[in-house]
Amino acid sequence: MPKTETYPRLLADIGGTNARFGLEVASRQIECIEVLRCEDFESLSDAVRFYLSKHQESLKLCPIYGSFAVATPIMGDFVQMTNNHWTFSIETTRQCLGLERLLVVNDFVAQAFAISTMQENDLAQVGGIKCEINAPKAVLGPGTGLGVSTLIQNSDGSLKVLPGEGGHVSFAPFDDLEILVWQYARSKFNHVSAERFLSGSGLVLIYEALSKRKSMEKVAKLSKAELTPQIISERALNGDYPLCRLTLDTFCSMLGTLAADVALTLGARGGVYLCGGIIPRFIDYFKTSPFRARFETKGRMGAFLASIPVHVVLKKTPGLDGVGIALENYLLHDKI
């Protein structure tokens, strides 16, 4: 078995929109971090080769171990990205890049591994009390899509991550307003999943649905060119666009519903961790948003949920951290 101290290791966190690359030069020490847009490259291998050529001067040795996190289920050697055009064979990619080992995991497996090493300043707590040691931790987060996984820390300190595709569960509206939003989405899609709303494109979809309401006929609206997740959230926070504010409030409420569903399903007394790039953009608003109230609005299970802390992950590159830890575990135990 290869020695675990062999560095550098090639790390990648590949989402629907961006691919983040880094070189782990020593345990938990990642350098040369770079973000590339997936749409700029025909294939994953092209993006990797571009990254390595750009950082050739920093490489004293060529990486022989690689660990990639991808935003799609891993169901064998062939990988097809859910939210971009890349497809690849793990084994062919390993050979093409000259690697001895290439580990490929779901992106939220990497996010979950990263949670295990986070410090207090990497997180912002939103309600709840204290995490229960060794209880399951729920990890989820809206980005280009919606990822969900579970982290379990055993009594001996070893880690186990359970991947899942919880972002694709059927969305259940909570009230009349959300029924209206659901009906709008149902007119466009055969299956209305949680990810349809709890993602960047979901924020736009919620806005479009709410703009059809009679009460919104005379309020200021965004132009087609302005209809992006970033602009919707920015206008929501400046107070001049009631429709944008209602959109963001609805988004946070819906996220509260899903986070509570996941917490109840897993018995996540170890806490709920929200990853992804969307929430940190408006963290101050999020702390006072409808999210926490909705999270606890579960009838007889309200008290159970009230004690569970929710943490927003503030760290910039948790996916790279996590995929490095996943590789470390794999090399030590020959399994994730």
From Swiss-Prot:
GO biological process, one term: glycolytic process
Catalysed conversion reaction: D-glucose + ATP = D-glucose 6-phosphate + ADP + H(+)
Binding of ATP, residues: A12, D13, I14, G15, G16, T17
Classification via Pfam families: Glucokinase
Superkingdom of this protein's organism: Bacteria
Enzyme class: transferase
One GO location term (cellular component): cytosol
Keyword annotations: ATP-binding, Cytoplasm, Glycolysis, Kinase, Nucleotide-binding, Transferase
Protein's UniProt keywords contain Signal: no
Classification via InterPro entries: ATPase_NBD, Bacterial_glucokinase, Glucokinase
PANTHER family: GLUCOKINASE
Name of the protein this chain belongs to: Glucokinase
Organism: Helicobacter acinonychis (strain Sheeba)
